Amino acid sequence: MPMASVIAVAEPKWISVWGRFLWLTLLSMALGSLLALLLPLGAVEEQCLAVLRSFHLLRSKLDRTQHVVTKCTSPSTELSVTSGDVGLLTVKTKTSPAGKLEAKAALNQALEMKRQGKREKAHKLFLHALKMDPGFVDALNEFGIFSEEEKDIIQADYLYTRALTISPFHEKALVNRDRTLPLVEEIDQRYFSIIDSKVKKVMSIPKGSSALRRVMEETYYHHIYHTVAIEGNTLTLSEIRHILETRYAVPGKSLEEQNEVIGMHAAMKYINTTLVSRIGSVTIDDMLEIHRRVLGYVDPVEAGRFRRTQVLVGHHIPPHPRDVEKQMQEFTQWLNSEDAMNLHPVEFAALAHYKLVYIHPFIDGNGRTSRLLMNLILMQAGYPPITILKEQRSEYYHVLEVANEGDVRPFIRFIAKCTEVTLDTLLLATTEYSVALPEAQPNHSGLKETLPVRP
């Protein structure tokens, strides 16, 4: 056979063998890559959590202009106010280099204006520095000193605490905080004493008082209205009263929203008739029973059950589902501990609310359940249940966020303020020339009876 023919015949065989070898090599590499991907599957949950946290951080950066802030004393600043002139700062976003430079320049100008005695200008410049860079520790400390000089001890202490949250070993802030902390604790205790005196006045109102009975009835409807409105429910006060009195639906309104009202009513009835006067510890089962009623008319599958999925709540990542039950057990132990019982009732109730909503044990209804637990603690201590108004929603969420960042005292003060407002309302409504709460109109004109809301 000619050589050319041999080569012509052998070449395809050589190409075929080489092709198979190449494919086997590629297949081995692919299998190796697949094996490398499969090996870490045992830790897939931790990886998912890391991804969630990364996504959460990215979202917070993208949304840095959409942070919820409460009303300010000055429209030119993003510092929110809870009581007095306490500014609440959030440092969830990374400040740009240009922002840091502007903040430093503003701080230097503020100190110069302060030295010259131009305190109003200095105040605005301090605010501007912190607006540009909320995590500027030196500005926080210097503004704290300025606030002390203005006799605003609570704001000064908050600013020092904020600085130490960011930089725990900042020497000047440590010294300043050591000076203001006992003063602030005294101020808080004095405020609790004022609340206690008002509680005694409310307790002295005759139980048969028709005015007290009337205002308590209206307060009941108002509480349901505001607590569901905070979560986005659009029903009016009159519509809520119609639903609870007739058990008939309001036409044109979401049945889910109406069932939220029925659930809140059922949960409040359960607390009032079963838990308030009961002697003994508050248990996990008690909280599950409250939640079962809160959510039972909207989502009976999830009602009274701990969540089984990871959730994100604003900037807060609650505990992993596998840790929820353990954390709830620890929370319940604290709830019934001597340390908790020795707290002022308002402080105890506020901390219980915060701790439960921090764990976020349920897929939905955590806020409503936390507010009900808070009121259960207050009522067991002889206080009336309090209402957080829907108009306070931004402030309410903001002080919760500040608590997540390490300072729960603004949230406690917020709850104390709500408690005092509730007490003042009861006292005002039971005086001779009282102005009671605006009543929900009993004549439901235009509200036709339709299919009953699920009982």
Curated annotation (Swiss-Prot):
Residues that coordinate or bind ATP: 231, 313-316, 364-371, 396-397, 404
Residues that carry a glycan: 272
Side Lumenal, residues: 42-455
Segments on the Cytoplasmic side according to the record's topology features: 1-20
Placement of sequence motif Inhibitory (S/T)XXXE(G/N) motif: 227-232
GO molecular function: AMPylase activity; ATP binding; Hsp70 protein binding; protein adenylylhydrolase activity; protein homodimerization activity; protein-folding chaperone binding
Annotated ranges, domain Fido: 282-417
Biological role stated in the UniProt entry: Protein that can both mediate the addition of adenosine 5'-monophosphate (AMP) to specific residues of target proteins (AMPylation), and the removal of the same modification from target proteins (de-AMPylation), depending on the context. The side chain of Glu-231 determines which of the two opposing activities (AMPylase or de-AMPylase) will take place. Acts as a key regulator of the ERN1/IRE1-mediated unfolded protein response (UPR) by mediating AMPylation or de-AMPylation of HSPA5/BiP.
Family: Belongs to the fic family.
Name of the protein in question: Protein adenylyltransferase FICD
Species name: Cricetulus griseus (Chinese hamster)
Gene, per the UniProt record: FICD
